[in-house]
Amino acid sequence: MDKFRVQGPTQLTGEVIISGAKNAALPILFAALLAEEPVEIQNVPKLRDIDTTMKLLSQLGARVERNGSVHVDAGPVNVFCAPYDLVKTMRASIWALGPLVARFGQGQVSLPGGCAIGARPVDLHINGLEQLGAKITLEEGYVKASVNGRLKGAHIVMDKVSVGATVTIMCAATLAEGKTIIENAAREPEIVDTANFLNTMGAKISGAGSDKIIIEGVKRLGGGVYRVLPDRIETGTFLVAAAVTGGKIVCRNTRPDTLDAVLAKLTDAGADIEVGEDWISLDMQGRRPKAVNIRTAPHPGFPTDMQAQFSLLNMVAEGTGVITETIFENRFMHIPELIRMGGHAEIESNTVICQGVARLSGAQVMATDLRASASLVIAGFVAQGTTIVDRIYHIDRGYESIEEKFRALGGQIDRIKGE
């Protein structure tokens, strides 16, 4: 398995171009299954999960190619099963189910894999599809969905806020007969992006970005061209990297309006921040950050996908910071690794209390999930000496060309190829 070797300490300074959002590109690629005509999707990041999704769409019979943009023609889809060998590495595969049953009246998806962070049950997806009239069975590790004729619009009140299930229900409802209302819907920018993509193809969706989404079913979706929104988590990760190393950075091709909670906490930490329509600059002027208190919450609250990066910030900050994780259990697996580098922290159930230290020391550490692995790489830039980050396949699932981007900011980082 590949590893990263990181030399520190380094003050990260310069400009970085932000890639398209993985968490919007994935649902959009699956939503393309609903279209009977070709679609062109621009600004799709080059990532392992994206490659897996493109392979999966091809196996279902779609014509998929990448030349700058990703082109998907789901017209010829004639296979309705997403097999285990592709699904096992990626939870997002469950998003194939809604479009398949909505357009073809049948679909089956192997129960998914992905990051090992807590319970992410597919129950909410299944309940939503059942309320739209699908018959669901679980057989031999597969979720199977079928319906006679079209799905029927329904008034669905979600038991808890779920980005994944909101996407599934919204996509399936676009081709249902009649009106669907989703209450307690997730409000993330990536939900809005997926809805905008569907509307480009002829769907009638309103209210995305609020907790109540209304979908007027249509008989078919056509083609279109759509540009995926920038990745707010990648943006936040690079901003934190500059903040913890006392550096100065400009993130370009980004969307400041998707990052209010993160920018507020970086300001609390002592960063000077400026924003334009599609850029954010952060300047620490060589200062150490101040510790901050954070409670993760569904959007527009503080994103759970930025929790690991801010845990690191608190470990090297002045003072003591408390972070409470309310979204996923088991999401502090990076903390013991940071403690091995000299950090001070205590975990009490879903809370981590970090006492800032003046410096970390390079060490061998292991990535456990996507965002945790990014925080370990950044820790390597703060630490004195050499840090080796193992299992970086997690990073490749969610960050495009991360080592090249860090090198352009002055970071010393190399990829060590595994056996």
UniProtKB/Swiss-Prot annotation:
Reactions the enzyme catalyzes: phosphoenolpyruvate + UDP-N-acetyl-alpha-D-glucosamine = UDP-N-acetyl-3-O-(1-carboxyvinyl)-alpha-D-glucosamine + phosphate
CDD domains xrefs: UdpNAET
Keywords assigned: Cell cycle, Cell division, Cell shape, Cell wall biogenesis/degradation, Cytoplasm, Peptidoglycan synthesis, Pyruvate, Transferase
InterPro entries linked to this entry: Enolpyruvate_Tfrase_dom, Enolpyruvate_Tfrase_sf, MurA_subfamily, RNA3'P_cycl/enolpyr_Trfase_a/b, UDP_GlcNAc_COvinyl_MurA
Modified residues (2-(S-cysteinyl)pyruvic acid O-phosphothioketal): C115
Pathway: Cell wall biogenesis; peptidoglycan biosynthesis
Major localization class: cytoplasm
Binding positions for UDP-N-acetyl-alpha-D-glucosamine per the UniProt entry: R91, R120, P121, V122, D123, L124, K160, V161, S162, V163, D305, I327
The EC number(s) this enzyme carries: 2.5.1.7
Compartment(s) where it occurs, according to its Swiss-Prot or TrEMBL record: Cytoplasm
Annotated residues for binding of phosphoenolpyruvate: K22, N23
Protein's GO biological process: cell division; cell wall organization; peptidoglycan biosynthetic process; regulation of cell shape; UDP-N-acetylgalactosamine biosynthetic process
Function: Cell wall formation. Adds enolpyruvyl to UDP-N-acetylglucosamine.
Membership in a protein family: Belongs to the EPSP synthase family. MurA subfamily.
Protein name (record): UDP-N-acetylglucosamine 1-carboxyvinyltransferase
